[in-house]
């Protein structure tokens, strides 16, 4: 049953990732990897929020921890695509884009996790 919860969350996370990515790229274009950037930063926020709330509610079924952080957020975010896009920008001589993407992803990712934890703590308070 554990695998089913991960798979269910993962399927929904993958669909959300695809939908959000397409929506962003259709509006902002592909000069910068806006879709992956937005997905990873919002995923960082969601992991901070979800784990803070789930940790405060240990009485919830373990299925929630499998379905949301492991399944949904795990499939929604994409470290490998982030790394690939950073390397491809550098290989194409777009060092400014590569450095900006790398640095802003890390900085805003950490900030988003923290913000998610702050919001999560307010929810459970």
Curated annotation (Swiss-Prot):
Entry's localization field: Cell inner membrane
Transmembrane portions of the chain: 4-24, 34-54, 99-119
Catalytic activity: fluoride(in) = fluoride(out)
GO biological process, one term: cellular detoxification of fluoride
First-listed, main subcellular location of the protein, grouped into a coarse class: membrane
Chain positions recorded as Na(+) binding sites: 74, 77
GO cellular component: plasma membrane
Inhibition and activation profile: Na(+) is not transported, but it plays an essential structural role and its presence is essential for fluoride channel function.
The protein's role, per its UniProt record: Fluoride-specific ion channel. Important for reducing fluoride concentration in the cell, thus reducing its toxicity.
Protein known as: Fluoride-specific ion channel FluC
Species this chain originates from: Acidobacterium capsulatum (strain ATCC 51196 / DSM 11244 / BCRC 80197 / JCM 7670 / NBRC 15755 / NCIMB 13165 / 161)
